[in-house]
UniProtKB/Swiss-Prot annotation:
Involved in the biosynthesis of ADP-glucose, a building block required for the elongation reactions to produce glycogen. Catalyzes the reaction between ATP and alpha-D-glucose 1-phosphate (G1P) to produce pyrophosphate and ADP-Glc. It catalyses: alpha-D-glucose 1-phosphate + ATP + H(+) = ADP-alpha-D-glucose + diphosphate. Keywords: ATP-binding, Carbohydrate metabolism, Glycogen biosynthesis, Glycogen metabolism, Nucleotide-binding, Nucleotidyltransferase, Transferase. Alpha-D-glucose 1-phosphate binds at residues 99, 164, 179-180, 190. This is Glucose-1-phosphate adenylyltransferase. It comes from Geobacillus thermodenitrificans (strain NG80-2). Homotetramer. InterPro entries: ADP-Glc_PPase (IPR011831), ADP_Glu_pyroP_CS (IPR005836), GlgC_bac (IPR023049), GlmU/GlgC-like_hexapep (IPR056818), NTP_transferase_dom (IPR005835), Nucleotide-diphossugar_trans (IPR029044), Trimer_LpxA-like_sf (IPR011004). The keyword Nucleotidyltransferase applies. The gene is glgC.
Length: 387
């Protein structure tokens, strides 16, 4: 059945800058915000925007992500016609060919796209935190009679060299694109969200695939090629909350942003819900002795200590006399009796030992607490005790 617009969601990235958080799971599956995973935001945006056909392209450590997405029920994407389809690399007569770049991942799934014969293809990244109505962007794309529309956001000039930067004319038509320029001419950064006219995208994916010198990436190869060919590329200005949670510090910051009273993301907005898989946990329990302030405390938590400006995921336990400040405690983790935790991300199922202390040496830094970190910390404590 023909679709006006379908989405291709790139979710195969490793996210190596998140260190141990992505050792066994893909970056889009990393927990966020007390009950979500990062990919929930993009999938929820699709549902809320009326995009009912989504191909999710996976590659790195896909097991948990595949299980989590399932048939898409949590996001109302369990449709007979369309819905969500997980698209890992697959074997053909010449063998298994891994995805070699963002553009190549979409190219290898041309047959999936063709079965819906769409007019437009929305290409998304599954590893950013934001709310966006893609229908507004599509209307803009059509009104501009564009071949390609790229969503952009203004970033501080001092940070512009970290992004793909668009230089536009007064009509917002893109006249120049530079990937991480040393001397940026603009502060309009690409958000990694593209709308293509499908016939044109198909043509240029085939051209790019035939080029042995290409890295097969949208930002590095396909977009510059379209600019050289004088195609109509427009920038779509986005003004809401958007966060690239590619580092431990930025992931912590995004979680802390949720605790601001007037935060732009607003998880409690009934008009734009962020959907997730229900963890099926019992209600939270906060003991009479506990003190909790400015925090998100999810289902299944047991809090007997002090929690200030922190995010607790499902199944977290905070022991008696324990203190947790400005921290993210991920699913199943525990802070034992009398322990102190500040400015930390505690990974799933980790246990902070009784009466221990976790805080960064640099006041502006963030500690990532993993099983390996705890092992090293315990060994150092034992050596000090022996001395």
């Amino acid at each position: 059945m023909k679709k006006k617009c379908i989405a291709m969601l790139l979710a195969g990235g490793q996210g190596s800058r998140l260190r141990s958080l992505t050792t066994n799971i893909a970056k889009p599956a990393v927990p966020f915000g007390g009950k979500y995973r990062i990919i929930d935001f993009t999938l929820s945006n699709c549902t809320n925007s009326g995009i009912d056909t989504v191909g999710v392209l996976t590659q790195y450590q896909p097991l948990l992500l595949h299980s989590y997405i399932g048939i898409g029920s949590a996001w109302d994407l369990d449709r007979r016609n369309g819905g969500v389809t997980v698209l890992p690399p697959y074997s053909v007569s010449s063998g298994v060919k891994w995805y070699e770049g963002t553009a190549n991942a979409v190219y290898q799934n041309i047959n999936y796209i063709e079965q819906y014969n769409p007019d437009y293809v929305l290409v998304l990244s599954g590893d950013h935190i934001y709310k966006m109505d893609y229908q507004h962007m599509l209307d803009y794309h059509i009104a501009k009679q564009a071949d390609v529309t790229i969503s952009v956001i203004e970033v501080p000039w001092e940070e512009a060299s970290r992004f793909g930067i668009m230089n536009t004319n007064e009509e917002m038509e893109i006249v120049e694109f530079a990937e991480k320029p040393a001397e940026p001419k603009s502060n309009l950064a690409s958000m990694g969200i593209y709308i293509f006219n499908w016939p044109l995208l198909k043509q240029y994916l085939q051209i790019d695939n035939a080029n042995p010198h290409s890295s097969h990436d949208f930002g590095k190869d396909v977009i510059p090629m379209l600019l050289r060919e004088k195609k109509r590329l427009f920038a779509y200005p986005f003004e809401g909350y958007w966060k690239d949670v590619g580092t431990v510090k930025s992931l912590w910051e995004a979680n802390m942003d949720l605790l601001d009273e007037n935060n732009e993301l607003d998880l409690f907005d009934r008009s734009w819900r962020i959907y997730s898989v229900n963890p099926n946990q019992p209600p939270q329990y906060i003991s009479p002795e506990a003190e909790v302030s400015d925090s998100l405390v999810n289902e299944g938590c047991v809090v007997e200590g002090t929690v200030e400006r922190s995010v607790l995921f499902q199944g977290v336990r905070i022991g008696k006399g324990a203190v947790v400040k400005e921290s993210v405690i991920m699913p199943g983790a525990a802070v034992s009796e009398g322990a102190y935790v500040e400015r930390a991300i505690v990974t799933p199922d980790s246990v902070i030992p009784p009466h221990s202390s976790v805080c960064p040496e640099d006041a502006d830094d963030v500690v990532l607490v993993t099983a390996e970190w705890l092992k090293q910390s315990n060994e150092e404590t034992a050596r000090k005790d022996e001395a």
